[in-house]
UniProtKB/Swiss-Prot annotation:
Gene3D superfamilies: 30s Ribosomal Protein S14, Chain N. It comes from the Bacteria. This is Small ribosomal subunit protein uS14. The lineage of its organism: Bacteria, Pseudomonadati, Campylobacterota, Epsilonproteobacteria, Campylobacterales. GO terms for molecular function: rRNA binding; structural constituent of ribosome; zinc ion binding. Binds 16S rRNA, required for the assembly of 30S particles and may also be responsible for determining the conformation of the 16S rRNA at the A site.
């Protein structure tokens, strides 16, 4: 889990727009966040395996 201070800092508007970055809405992870879902790859995989994200399924070929 991310520090609460870092999550609060990310929620504040950045002084410059180039400093803004995305964080996972569930765990607060700053890296590998999918913009379409707003969550990180770890949480995305967990929710997809549980079937909680409609239209998303594990690929097999």
């Amino acid at each position: 889990m991310a520090k609460k201070s870092m999550i609060a800092k990310a929620n504040r508007p950045a002084k410059f727009s180039s400093r803004a970055y995305t964080r996972c809405k569930i765990c607060g992870r700053p890296h590998s966040v999918y913009r379409d879902f707003g969550i990180c790859r770890v949480c995305l995989r967990k929710l997809a395996n549980e079937g909680l994200i409609p239209g998303l399924k594990k690929a097999s070929w």
